Amino acid sequence: MNVPMLDLSEQYEQLKPEIMRVLDEVMRSSRFILGDYVKKLEADIAAYSRAKHGIGCGNGSDAIHIALQAAGVGPGDEVITTAFTFFATAGSIARAGAKPVFVDIDPVTFNIDPAQVEAAVTEKTKAIIPVHLYGQMADMEAIAAIAKRHGLVVIEDAAQAIGAKYNGKCVGELGTAATYSFFPTKNLGAYGDGGMIITNDDELAEKCRVIRVHGSKPKYYHHVLGYNSRLDEMQAAILSVKFPHLDRWTEQRRKHAATYTRLLEEAVGDLVVTPKEVDGRYHVFHQYTIRAPKRDELQAFLKEQGIATMVYYPLPLHLQPVFASLGYKEGQLPEAEKAAKEALSLPMFPELKEEQQQYVVEKIAEFYRHFA
C-alpha cells in the first residue's frame, strides 16, 4: 500500500464542476486582479475570523511582511518569534529590516513559550509573532498580556491554523492582526500561491491595502514604498469554492487525528509521543506530528513501505546559516533543537482512509519491534 503525505486529487474531482464554472466566469469577465472574487473571499474570511478586514495578498510570507510594515516595524526594531517554524516567519521580519529574536518553545505544543517571550523583551522590541504551529493556537492570552504590558504589536502567523480557536476566540482576535497562507497544501489551499491579512484595526488594514499595490493611493501616486503582492482573481475564485467545505474538512482532520492517537497508543504505547490538544484549544490538525525516537531511521523505513512522512522542521531558525550573524549557538534553545530531532509528521488530509492509517501505524509498530 502507498500512503501519500497529501492527496489533493480526490478533493479536486469532487469540486471540479464548480471550480471549472468559476474559472470560466473569471476568464469571461477579463477581471483578473482584485476583482469580485477577491473582494468576496476577503469578506468571507474576515467574517469567519470575526475580523473587520481581510486583505488578500500574494502569499503567506508577504502577508507577514506587509502586516509588519503596516504596523511600523522596520530597521532598528526587534521582533520576538519562535525558533521552531517555517523560515518565512523570520525571513519576513528580516525583509522588513528588523532583527528576529528567537525564543524557545513549549515542548507539549511545539508553540512559542510565553515565559521565554517575556524574558526576551528589550527597549528595542516592537512586535511579537507567535506561530500557531501544526494547527493549534499558541498561548494567546499570555502573549497578549505581555504585549499589553510592553506596548507591543502582535502579528499571529496562522498559516497552518485557519479555523483554530483559543478559549472560543478565533485566530486574530487576541492580536493586532493575523496572517493566513493559501499554499496548496494548507487546510484551505489554492492551486498556486495566496495569502491574507485579517485585522480589526481600520488604520492597519488601510495601510496593508496600500502597501500591497506598490504603496499607491490613489493609483500612480506613491507615499510609501510598497510591493506588488495581490491575491489574483483565479485563486480567489478557487478558494471561494473550497471555503464552504473548510469546517467539514477540519472535522475530518480531527477525526483522523483521534484515530491516529488511538491506534498509536494501542500499538506502541508511549514509545512515541502523540499530539496533545490543550484544554480550551480547538486544533485543526494541519499536521499530525509525533515525537519519535530514531526519527530519521523510522522515516527511512516508512518510505520503504510506501508511506510518505515529513520533518517539519529539521533545523531550527536560530541555527540557520543565514542567521549566523545573530550569534546563536547550538544548545541555546534546547526544546526547539530537540523537536527538530524528534518531530515527524504523518500523512494527514481530509480524504485519508482509516485503512491507510492502520497501515501507517502497523508499520511504525513493526519498526519499533524489529529495529529500535
Curated annotation (Swiss-Prot):
CDD domains: AHBA_syn. Its main location: membrane. Keywords: Cell membrane, DNA-binding, Membrane, Pyridoxal phosphate, Transcription, Transcription regulation, Two-component regulatory system. GO terms for biological process: phosphorelay signal transduction system; polysaccharide biosynthetic process. One of its GO terms (molecular function) is transaminase activity. The keyword Phosphoprotein does not apply. This membrane protein may function as a sensor protein and may transfer the signal of environmental stimuli to the regulatory region of target genes to activate or repress transcription of the genes. This is Pleiotropic regulatory protein. It comes from Geobacillus stearothermophilus (Bacillus stearothermophilus). The lineage of its organism: Bacteria, Bacillati, Bacillota, Bacilli, Bacillales.
